A protein has these predicted regions:
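Internal, conserved structured core segments that host functional sites
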Residues: 99-173, 179
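Conserved small/polar residues in nucleotide/adenosyl-binding loops
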Residues: 253-260
Length: 264
């Protein structure tokens, strides 16, 4: 696939299709597609045979589009975002740096509370499980989540959501952990894109503080939205799709579902 820029439009071209004399002309005419750059929120590059011009990269970043690159297993491994996404960026940076510890703890309290509430909603909708305990935990979250109710809720949530023998939520664990990893990676990119567009520094988190993590704030803000990915994965399993490998069909399902998020 060759990606280029023409009249502020992304041109997606399949050179091998054009060169193939055995294919009908009608099929060849469909070998080139154009998409408005301004309508794109996230672009996922998931093939080693993709060629992309610097003009396309520049146009995508100028329009605040997140660019994700994937490895041979279709897992996102790289993320490119614009350096300047907001005219008041410097002011926003200073506000982040000057945030008091009580404010930071209150923000994390709100984040954890919403995450548990969303987990409860997904668990009740998908698995029909009793969620009264999760509702209580959400209401009892203190400033900074000093009682670590996030972990308690997560243990109950994962035990009752998929009900797959031997399943625990582990990045390196058995399927559907692979589908969850993929969905979270796309969600993380969408959130990071939104933070940059808002003039915020994605590196400076309110809870995550890994010195090697360039997207600590994105990891914080995405927490309440993780159950959205969990519900998508649950539906994929219910439809009988093979979750042992991250197929193009499964990836497409995730990406289509995240289009709404990318427009936020």
């Amino acid at each position: 696939v060759y990606l280029s820029l023409r009249n502020a439009q992304l041109v997606i071209k399949l050179p091998e299709v054009v060169k193939n004399d055995t294919l009908p002309d009608g099929f060849k005419q469909q070998s080139e597609v154009t998409k408005p750059i301004e309508d794109l929120g996230v672009v996922v590059l998931d093939n080693k045979q993709i060629t992309i011009t610097s003009g396309v990269l520049e146009a995508l970043l100028e329009n605040n589009c997140a660019i994700i690159t994937c490895d041979s297993k279709s897992m996102p491994v790289g993320l490119m975002l614009p350096l300047y996404g907001n005219t008041t960026q410097n002011e926003r940076f200073r506000q982040q740096l000057d945030a008091s510890l009580p404010l930071i703890k209150q923000l994390w309290q709100q984040t954890v509370r919403m995450k548990i509430e969303n987990q409860a909603a997904v668990l009740k909708k998908c698995a029909g499980e009793e969620v009264k305990c999760m509702t209580i935990w959400a209401a009892d979250v203190k400033s900074g989540d000093s009682d670590n109710l996030e972990a308690r809720a997560a243990a109950y949530y994962w035990k009752n959501l998929f009900k797959i023998k031997g399943f625990t939520r582990d990045r390196e664990g058995i399927p559907p952990n692979n589908l969850l990893n993929y969905g979270y990676a796309i969600l993380r990119a969408v959130v990071a894109r939104g933070l940059v567009a808002s003039g915020l520094l994605p590196t400076l988190g309110i809870h995550h503080h890994n010195r090697y993590n360039a997207y600590c704030l994105a990891d914080d803000i995405m927490e309440p939205y993780r159950p959205y990915v969990d519900e998508l994965v649950y539906k994929i399993l219910q439809e009988g799709m093979n979750c042992n490998e991250l197929t193009k069909a499964v990836s497409y399902t995730h990406l289509r579902a995240h289009e709404t998020c990318a427009d936020l």
